[in-house]
Amino acid sequence: MTGLRIILVSPLADGWAVICAGLEPLVFRSGARAEAQAKRLAACLAKLGRAVQVRIHDRARNLVGTQLYPAV
């Protein structure tokens, strides 16, 4: 998949980060809120013609979920 943009939801010492190349990291206290924001961001980018994959990591930094948002 050429041009696939990756959005990571990753743990921090005191919260969760949403990380996407070209954007400032977003920080949340709740993992659920970080995941929800990552999915909203992915949906917006997909509507703008960019394929996006959201990757969710747990506190141990294991990959626990992915979701693909194809370009619209």
Regions found by a protein language model. Name each.
Residues M1-E24:
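Short aromatic-glycine-(Arg/Gly/Cys) micro-motifs in beta-strand/loop hairpins
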Residues A21, S30-G31, L68:
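Surface loops and adjacent helix of pleckstrin homology
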Residues E24-P25, L63:
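Short, solvent-exposed loop/turn motifs
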Residues L26-R29, H57:
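Intrinsically disordered, low-complexity proline/glycine-rich segments
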Residues R29-K47:
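A short, charged, amphipathic alpha-helix used as a generic interaction element across diverse proteins
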Residues K47-V72:
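Short, mixed-charge low-complexity intrinsically disordered segments
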